[in-house]
């Protein structure tokens, strides 16, 4: 089993958040490693999509930044490729993920699953206005 946190390696805030994710995993017995994110700056996104036979059409929508959206998907897809090529389970965490408990072992599910406890609007309201920490 491999556990990755997708990290924009040249973005300090992404790296800091990913380190928190790694430490939170370690606190619950899960070793997580950085997975360098695909970005428009470090990857030819269109070429990567063509090589993998991924159609761009589903990524075009009014409000998204197309290349960023495609790059984020490609980061996840790259982790899935590892799972397929190495015939192993892979857990993929966003850089701002934070584990508050152990991940069930074994999961008894093979495929794609979302593990989380969304706040559903019950998050802590920040006491300031403006940019804050991740």
What residue ranges belong to the model's regions?
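An acidic/histidine-cluster motif and surrounding catalytic segment
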Residues: 1-93, 97-134
């Amino acid at each position: 089993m491999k556990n990755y946190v997708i990290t924009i390696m040249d973005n300090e805030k992404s790296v800091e958040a990913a380190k928190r994710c790694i430490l939170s995993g370690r606190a619950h017995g899960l070793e997580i490693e950085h997975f360098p994110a695909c970005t428009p700056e470090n990857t030819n996104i269109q070429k990567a999509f063509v090589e993998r036979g991924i159609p761009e059409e589903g990524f075009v929508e009014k409000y998204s930044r197309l290349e960023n959206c495609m790059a984020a998907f490609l980061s996840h897809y790259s982790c899935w490729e590892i799972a397929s090529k190495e015939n192993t389970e892979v857990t993929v965490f966003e850089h701002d993920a934070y584990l508050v408990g152990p991940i069930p072992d074994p999961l008894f599910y093979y495929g794609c699953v979302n593990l989380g406890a969304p706040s559903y609007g019950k998050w802590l309201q920040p006491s300031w206005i403006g940019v804050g920490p991740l």
